From Swiss-Prot:
Modified residues (Phosphoserine): S45, S174, S186, S206, S252, S271, S283
Stated role: Binds to actin filaments in muscle and non-muscle cells. Plays a central role, in association with the troponin complex, in the calcium dependent regulation of vertebrate striated muscle contraction. Smooth muscle contraction is regulated by interaction with caldesmon. In non-muscle cells is implicated in stabilizing cytoskeleton actin filaments.
Subcellular location per the Swiss-Prot or TrEMBL entry: Cytoplasm, Cytoskeleton
Keywords (A to Z) from UniProt: Acetylation, Actin-binding, Cardiomyopathy, Coiled coil, Cytoplasm, Cytoskeleton, Disease variant, Muscle protein, Phosphoprotein
Main location: cytoplasm
Quaternary structure note: Homodimer. Heterodimer of an alpha (TPM1, TPM3 or TPM4) and a beta (TPM2) chain. Interacts with HRG (via the HRR domain); the interaction contributes to the antiangiogenic properties of the histidine/proline-rich region (HRR) of HRG. Interacts (via N-terminus) with LMOD2 (via N-terminus) and TMOD1 (via N-terminus).
InterPro entries: Tropomyosin
Tissue expression from the record: Detected in primary breast cancer tissues but undetectable in normal breast tissues in Sudanese patients. Isoform 1 is expressed in adult and fetal skeletal muscle and cardiac tissues, with higher expression levels in the cardiac tissues. Isoform 10 is expressed in adult and fetal cardiac tissues, but not in skeletal muscle.
Family designation: Belongs to the tropomyosin family.
Organism field: Homo sapiens (Human)
The protein's name: Tropomyosin alpha-1 chain
PTM annotation, UniProt: Phosphorylated at Ser-283 by DAPK1 in response to oxidative stress and this phosphorylation enhances stress fiber formation in endothelial cells.
Phosphotyrosine, modified sites: Y261
Amino acid sequence: MDAIKKKMQMLKLDKENALDRAEQAEADKKAAEDRSKQLEDELVSLQKKLKGTEDELDKYSEALKDAQEKLELAEKKATDAEADVASLNRRIQLVEEELDRAQERLATALQKLEEAEKAADESERGMKVIESRAQKDEEKMEIQEIQLKEAKHIAEDADRKYEEVARKLVIIESDLERAEERAELSEGKCAELEEELKTVTNNLKSLEAQAEKYSQKEDRYEEEIKVLSDKLKEAETRAEFAERSVTKLEKSIDDLEDELYAQKLKYKAISEELDHALNDMTSI
């Protein structure tokens, strides 16, 4: 009997230990599931962040494309401005040549005017000296007056042409200044676009590095998930084994209880037989 009780106590203790191990295995399983769920949530979050990074990359790619288009447009404007400057330089050269020719004509007209004035003076002196040749002198004087008028007309025309050339030169200089300002603005815009392009390129490199970092983290998380999945499978296997052990122990306890009950019945029967025997002996 003592051996049976001791064995039952040991079996109950084994049962309690098995139940404790099963509960611990269940707790490990739940913790592993929670960790797996947390890692899945982190993975989803990282995927969202990666999607956001890809969206930003697309946005910066569009910005880079716009910057390149603006740069090409600025280069075209700068080229057009340079062509305008070259055209203006050619026009200025032509105007300067025309001005030189006008100045030469003006100098010739002034020289003729001076000669005509000298001739007029000589004519006046000749009129005083030789009155007998008045008619001839008058004709000569008329010719000289006509030449004088022509010289004055040439001089006036040269003055007008000179003023017109000077006015055109002022307009051309103003156009040249505006063209130079446009060229300077185009150069400044090109510099700004180049700086913006550098910034976009640096941001793009930073985003590529960040995406690479996210990819490395994702690989590391996948590895951790795999390890935790293996641990979860191992915990489930241990839990199943513990449950089978508990089932076996419970069956063993049930068998021992049945055997104990049978022994009690047998002991009761033997006790009754002994009582009957004692009663019979007492009756005798």
